[in-house]
Amino acid sequence: MDRERMMKNVAEIFSRGAVEKNLPAWVNMRHAWKASDAARDRGLEYPANVVQIKNLDYKKELDEVRFNELIEIWNKGQHTNDSDNSVQLQNKEILNDTVDLTYEADETPKSRCEGLERNVVRFADSGDAADVDSASYTSNSYMDICVPISYMTDENRKYPVIVSVHGGGWFYGDKELYSHYCCLLAEHGYVVVNFNYRLSPQNKYPAAIEDVAYLIRYIHENAQTLGIDIDNFYMVGDSAGAQLTANYCIIASNSDYRAKLDFFTYDLLPKKVCLNCGAYKMAERNDNISAWYLRNDVDDDQNSDGKTSSHDKAEKCESKKISQAYAVTEEQYKLFMDQLDYINADFPEAYLMYSVNDDLASHTKAVD
């Protein structure tokens, strides 16, 4: 693994993953996470040389023994003479008590792999195992890690890590929308963390930014077990995810700002960040933000599969103001609005990106 090359070109890799490999039309879209919706609807293939370890609960203690057992079981599934199905044989769905620890190397796992689209290892709590198709996908404290296939057999694994923060206006979205994008980044030799966080209006500020901090604490404290090099830690965020990423970095890099906050924070800073189509100028009322998240255009009401879009969901929010859907008290509201005033020299190097027709382009230009 050419670690020096990866560190040098991290911003280029972020960009290439989002634009060239994921969806070239991204540059003409009105907003970044629309590309993720489109990618999902088009059913893009996942890279065969990337494995997803799914549904670790970052608000609970990591079961190191179980984590390593699942990787060992997954590796046993690689040893097969069925060369006609080599890619599919790398896939295995593992659900807690259904795992057979006596699984033999010469047993073909083809029957276990039917219908799976990509390499997946499920890490679900026993209480969720029976309902893995719903609870384990929607839990707001679940995370996935996307890893290069070499990670699974590397006994001394220590990979650079990218934390991806999904977008959706703080009230929409989940990790599944970003799984393809995260797998593409993992192809370059990274462990990519893809996670859910609490959404509004059910969860007000600071729930989302607290969850970002909880997540980063989790990977920091479990870096050795997870096989990550915390000294080479990066973040990428889209839309609301970009705002959360920037907000986390402001909090982590500015002790004065951090001292004013009355919720859980963490101070581990990423080396570099990539901010895609973010909303940063929270201190001013921006009609483009309201128009983007709250409009109800006929053309955008439904996705190509006929499902209700996020814009229709937005109409059900109590307030037309994004800030009111996100913030709670006047004091918290002011700190949220004034966050850009607290950017200092310790803020990590940032790669800012926006699409040509992005409604929030002015926000990126203002902080560039």
Feature locations, PLM:
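Alpha/beta-hydrolase superfamily serine-hydrolase fold, recognizing
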Residues: 2-368
